């Protein structure tokens, strides 16, 4: 039986020998050395992941964690709270942004209810902790035990999907007001004032942004999360969707498989996961630079450079779906290009 400790202890660094071998092969392909730029770096990163059998990925999946947030009551979003459950239903119909992009990328979408403030939505994986987290502006989002249990449950869900053949994961989230706890988590882990982190989320009016900043600042002051303790931070100022995404990262990394990040809330979850197990970072693939204000700061602390710059801020896992094409391209380059030595071409470099 898996425990959170056993999953964390199974996370190891990338295989440097395999990565060096891949770099040598890439340098021998029919192209100038390094001319594929970061696509080559991606192929080398994938080579170091012991869960992959060469550069072959047969099944891809985006896990979307869905939850409501008590801090919604502080007026930090203009979207109706009911939109969380309604949009989760739309995901089951396959008509949302992530569903369309995932289908285009050859990936399936698994939608998980970790805390929707509604009755169970048909078709969703039911891992509901509560009907919405606590209001972080008034107290903790959840208990420490709830955070630990959800981390483990999410990691185990990921391991279950791996037994079903999934080799590449993306993470996504859905939940009205969730950029507020995400901003709180990023503020704590990066030691920045919320003024530097808080953004407009789902079109929150810029003239009211000072209120959202104040709410995040109040949440941190009231809960006093310990930045050295990821679970404490997630429990006090996070949310069920953030915890769920962090659990996916831990689970995939524990068996050496990659996880593609999405936008700002996934950066918050990644910061937490990497504090729990620093080697998780090597299994993360940053898809795009979210347009949310604190994104650059979060990614700098993760030491990750996003591949795509599209001014996106939809969430759901939409950026992860787009980046799956890049992973496919890196594998195709490695597997299918010819060798320079067999091309009758002699390059001066």
UniProtKB/Swiss-Prot annotation:
Pfam family membership, one: DBI_PRT
Q: Which UniProt keywords apply?
A: Cobalamin biosynthesis, Glycosyltransferase, Transferase
Is Acetylation among the key words of this record? no
Catalytic reaction(s) noted: 5,6-dimethylbenzimidazole + nicotinate beta-D-ribonucleotide = alpha-ribazole 5'-phosphate + nicotinate + H(+)
Do the record's keywords include Transferase?
Answer: yes
- Please give the biological process terms from Gene Ontology that the record holds: cobalamin biosynthetic process
| Pathway(s) per entry | Nucleoside biosynthesis; alpha-ribazole biosynthesis; alpha-ribazole from 5,6-dimethylbenzimidazole: step 1/2
Q: What is its EC number?
A: 2.4.2.21
Family annotation (CDD domains): DMB-PRT_CobT (cd02439)
Q: Where in the sequence is the active site?
A: 316 (proton acceptor)
Q: Which domain of life is it from?
A: Bacteria
* Broadest EC class assigned to this enzyme: transferase
Q: Which SUPFAM superfamilies does this UniProt record tie to the protein?
A: Nicotinate mononucleotide:5,6-dimethylbenzimidazole phosphoribosyltransferase (CobT)
What HAMAP family does the entry give? CobT
The protein's job, in short, is: Catalyzes the synthesis of alpha-ribazole-5'-phosphate from nicotinate mononucleotide (NAMN) and 5,6-dimethylbenzimidazole (DMB).
Give the UniProt family note: Belongs to the CobT family.
NCBIfam families xref list? cobT_DBIPRT, PRK00105.1
Q: What's the name of the protein?
A: Nicotinate-nucleotide--dimethylbenzimidazole phosphoribosyltransferase
In which organism is this protein found?
Photorhabdus laumondii subsp. laumondii (strain DSM 15139 / CIP 105565 / TT01) (Photorhabdus luminescens subsp. laumondii)
The UniProt gene name for this protein comes to cobT
């Amino acid at each position: 039986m898996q425990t959170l400790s056993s999953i964390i202890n199974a996370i190891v660094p990338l295989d440097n020998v395999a990565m060096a071998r891949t770099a040598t092969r890439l340098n021998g392909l029919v192209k100038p050395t390094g001319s594929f730029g970061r696509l080559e770096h991606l192929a080398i990163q994938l080579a170091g992941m012991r869960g992959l059998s060469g550069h072959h990925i047969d099944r891809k999946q985006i896990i979307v964690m869905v939850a409501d947030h008590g801090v919604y009551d502080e007026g930090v979003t203009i979207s109706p709270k009911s939109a969380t459950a309604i949009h989760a239903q739309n995901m089951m119909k396959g008509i949302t942004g992530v569903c369309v992009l995932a289908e285009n990328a050859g990936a399936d979408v698994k939608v998980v209810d970790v805390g929707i403030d509604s009755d169970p939505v048909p078709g969703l994986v039911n891992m509901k902790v509560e009907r919405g987290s606590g209001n972080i502006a008034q107290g903790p989002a959840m208990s420490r035990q709830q955070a630990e249990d959800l981390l483990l449950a999410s990691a185990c869900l990921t391991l279950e999907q791996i037994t079903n053949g999934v080799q590449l994961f993306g993470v996504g989230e859905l939940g009205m007001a969730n950029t507020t706890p995400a901003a709180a988590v990023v503020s704590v882990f990066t030691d920045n004032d919320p003024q530097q982190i808080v953004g407009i989320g789902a079109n929150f009016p810029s003239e009211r942004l000072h209120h959202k900043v104040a709410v995040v600042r109040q949440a941190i002051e009231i809960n006093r999360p310990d930045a050295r303790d990821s679970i404490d931070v997630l429990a006090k100022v996070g949310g069920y969707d953030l915890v769920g995404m962090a659990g996916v990262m831990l689970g995939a990394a524990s068996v050496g498989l990659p996880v593609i990040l999405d936008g700002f809330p996934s950066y918050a979850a990644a910061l937490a996961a990497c504090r729990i197990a620093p080697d998780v970072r090597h299994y993360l693939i940053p898809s795009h630079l979210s347009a949310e204000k604190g994104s650059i700061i979060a990614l700098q602390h993760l030491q990750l450079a996003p591949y795509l710059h599209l001014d996106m801020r939809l969430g759901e896992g939409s950026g992860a779906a787009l980046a799956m094409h890049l992973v496919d391209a890196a594998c195709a380059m490695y597997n299918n290009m010819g060798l320079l030595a067999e091309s009758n071409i002699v390059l001066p470099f």
